[in-house]
Amino acid sequence: MRRRYNSAMPADAIPLSRIRRVLVTKLRHHGDVLLASPVFTALKAAAPQVQIDGLVYADTAEMLSGHPDLSELHVIDRSWKRLGLMGQGKAEWSLLKTLQSRQYDLIIHLTEHPRGAWLSRLLKPRYAVAPRVSGRGRFWKGSFSHFVPSIMGSGRRHVVEQNLDALRRLGVQPAHDKRALTFVPGADAEAHIAVRLQALGLEPGKFVHLHPPSRWHFKCWTAEGWAEIIARIRAAGWPVLLTAAPGDKEGHLIERIQTALAQRSEPPAASLAGALSLKELGALTAQARLFAGVDSAPMHIAAAMRTPVVVLFGPSGEGHWGPWGTPRLGTHQVIAQSAQFNCRPCGLDGCGGGKVSECLTSIRPDQVWAAIQPLLKD
């Protein structure tokens, strides 16, 4: 029987009813992986019979694990490189055999990573979709059945929508109510955080969660600015809880904030810096009145948990990376200096590549407080 033409769909739209298993790959950082979660939700809603697997780096697996529309989650461990040629080869071979056993009908490759082309050729799905990448040769172009076109001014289109464009290219229009981020902390993380909050004397919904650092210094605001904000939040009657990722890269800013508080004769802020897993961070921020921070994975986790977000943006673009979704109360608030700095968003690692972004460090505490204060009112 000839397929009926539908002008509202691509001419080469895939027949969803024939798809049984799908592999979605997102080989990027933590926040990038979380921003791919709506692909699973929207695809499952459009094709309930489909089993959807994910392939991510092992250190980002917590961003997707527990997703209700995820069948199996496969990982690539970047530490395999330290196993030597034989050890890495054995690990890669084991992963390949596992993926081959799943017999995928469709691969959705959401990045420009060259591994996607190899996987498409080795796994031999009926269909495979990837971004159209300028300058890629025959190997890339011959590895996929469908390509997502690049768009002018893509920095103004949110990453979530860009991920969903892979579905649109295949003829699947994502339902508006299926585009939310999904992050599942899990019962263990929630129980752990309940104990932690009780030990700190903090009640659910009665504290402000601040995550000032980013792994990238050029995305960070000043320690003095954060100390001023902490003082104002406290003066309004709200306790503050600081978090940061393990390690000195983020922990150093927390130390500087505590020092700045001491210089203001303020007591140190309660802190769980370096003490939480990503799942626990999600369970924590879900209990906060609001989250304040910078462009980082914890910001995206807070948005996924529907916690109101106040976020400071510098060289990265809020149209591309801003908080996604609808919070429990109020609205997400983005603070950016676009009028004063018409060079932003530039995407550089600081002005002139110097690791300090003036469009970010020039943000005044008054601007941040003006965004936070309304969200603290009952």
Segments and roles (model prediction):
Residues 1-378:
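Catalytic machinery of carbohydrate-active enzymes
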